Amino acid sequence: MRKHSDCMNFCAVDATKGICRLSKQMINLDDSACPEIKVMPKCKNCKNFVEANDEGIGKCVGLEKEDWVYSTLNAITCEGHVFNE
């Protein structure tokens, strides 16, 4: 399930809510995303994110040096991010 926080149109206001840039409405970040979602690059949707455990910690193998990362880490500026198929 994709959440509002997985969308490029979500603008965080605090730790639990934000504003949708499309509707201009206040929304909870953990609610289900709308059909207009523009998926935010995050480690969890990258083909280079592997071996994730139950807590969402995995390994990035897409950069020069492999390292442990959180699945929810924003990867908008990551040079190694490649969306999963």
UniProtKB/Swiss-Prot annotation:
Catalytic activity of the protein: 4-hydroxyphenylacetate + H(+) = 4-methylphenol + CO2; 3,4-dihydroxyphenylacetate + H(+) = 4-methylcatechol + CO2
EC number: 4.1.1.83
The name this protein goes by in its record: 4-hydroxyphenylacetate decarboxylase small subunit
Phylogenetic placement of the source organism: Bacteria, Bacillati, Bacillota, Clostridia, Peptostreptococcales
Gene for this chain: hpdC
Subunit structure: Heterooctamer consisting of 4 large (HpdB) subunits and 4 small (HpdC) subunits, arranged as a tetramer of heterodimers.
Chain positions recorded as [4Fe-4S] cluster 1 binding sites: 4, 7, 20, 34
Single Gene Ontology MF annotation: 4-hydroxyphenylacetate decarboxylase activity
Annotated keywords: 4Fe-4S, Iron, Iron-sulfur, Lyase, Metal-binding
Main function: Component of the HPA decarboxylase that decarboxylates phenylacetates with a hydroxyl group in the p-position. Active toward 4-hydroxyphenylacetate and 3,4-dihydroxyphenylacetate, forming 4-methylphenol and 4-methylcatechol, respectively. Is likely involved in the catabolism of aromatic amino acids such as tyrosine fermentation. 4-methylphenol (p-cresol) formation provides metabolic toxicity, which allows an active suppression of other microbes and may provide growth advantages for the producers in highly competitive environments.
Entry keyword annotation includes 4Fe-4S: yes
Family, as annotated: Belongs to the HPA decarboxylase small subunit family.
Species name: Clostridioides difficile (strain CD196) (Peptoclostridium difficile)
Required cofactor names: [4Fe-4S] cluster
CC cofactor note: Binds 2 [4Fe-4S] clusters per subunit.
Pfam families for this protein: 4HPAD_g_N, HPIP_like
Ligand binding ([4Fe-4S] cluster 2): 43, 46, 60, 78
Top-rank EC class of the record's enzyme: lyase
